[in-house]
Amino acid sequence: MDTIFLWSLLLLFFGSQASRCSAQKNTEFAVDLYQEVSLSHKDNIIFSPLGITLVLEMVQLGAKGKAQQQIRQTLKQQETSAGEEFFVLKSFFSAISEKKQEFTFNLANALYLQEGFTVKEQYLHGNKEFFQSAIKLVDFQDAKACAEMISTWVERKTDGKIKDMFSGEEFGPLTRLVLVNAIYFKGDWKQKFRKEDTQLINFTKKNGSTVKIPMMKALLRTKYGYFSESSLNYQVLELSYKGDEFSLIIILPAEGMDIEEVEKLITAQQILKWLSEMQEEEVEISLPRFKVEQKVDFKDVLYSLNITEIFSGGCDLSGITDSSEVYVSQVTQKVFFEINEDGSEAATSTGIHIPVIMSLAQSQFIANHPFLFIMKHNPTESILFMGRVTNPDTQEIKGRDLDSL
């Protein structure tokens, strides 16, 4: 029985127009994914709803019957005409493909085919038109060589941050088609953090224990809100990147509150409420410097969201090939996520040095305990990444004597 592998390889490096209706549906799907992923991952989480959406849409392009219906239902597309979503994606690719000086954002898709395996020309054409996919012929019988070839493509598209993604064991004689998605983002903060202000601070993990972590500090004028709902108090902060096309939203529960209780509040409507009610003000910010690399198997997650048919031997993928025994065996995503102080020296607005004694009039946003985050593409209102930080990786503060802190 032939198999299809879906790989969504994502790299997010924080250095320094779909319609509104479509954005709303994408946000709802992103929240659904987060709620399911959080059930099986109790510590740090990082994943890309955009990446999962893309690989599912690549399958839907060739899916028929129940397989197509399940994908459309899970992606909240019941109220749109079949096929409309692909033209929305085409517009999205057009919106993000323009090169900008303020940031680097690369979104690449590739389709690897077994030599001699017949794939319908219409499907190949659709992948090029809607997903800008590169199409490559390989021999999966030589699993090791294929793994090296695809891993090299991933490494190149992610600027070398994700290496040796595949091993020969992941491909076999039944492998016929591998869909790969890679995302790379590198952006400078619109208002940067000064490295000399970073200090070692205790971070309280979810289990109550503490760990010393580098804490970035700045006094910035940015969007901020304090919310109180269902006996839960929490803060929401939005940090913009240069160019204002991307921003990072951080949700911080009040100290001592269970982050899982705040997670239960998250809905698409709630996110829209935060965005509309936050006000721009001066905020004293303390944010961990950290990096996380995570690989997530989404097969069980998608099963829980009622996408089951594509994983069965009898699914109808006749829009891809006439072979009657083709199915999806894996949906896996890997993300590299890093956030630090770096910003452009040419930035027009810079974080203010924080003295030892702060004015009590300032709002304080001190992320020294678990928090949630969302990265969005502002022009399309699309959620690119979502995650949770419960235990930041400890890093050295270069060029400073830590014993003196």
Curated annotation (Swiss-Prot):
Subcellular location(s) per record: Secreted
GO function term, MF aspect, one: serine-type endopeptidase inhibitor activity
Pfam families documented for this protein: Serpin
Site residues, Reactive bond: 357-358
CDD domains documented for this protein: serpinI2_pancpin
GO CC annotations on file: extracellular exosome; extracellular space
Keywords: Glycoprotein, Protease inhibitor, Secreted, Serine protease inhibitor, Signal
Main localization, broad class: secreted
Top-level division of the source organism's lineage: Eukaryota
Expression across tissues: Expressed in pancreas and adipose tissues.
Residues bearing attached sugar chains per UniProt: 202, 207, 306
Secretion signal span: 1-18
Sequence similarity: Belongs to the serpin family.
Protein name according to UniProt: Serpin I2
Highest classification ranks of the organism: Eukaryota, Metazoa, Chordata, Craniata, Vertebrata
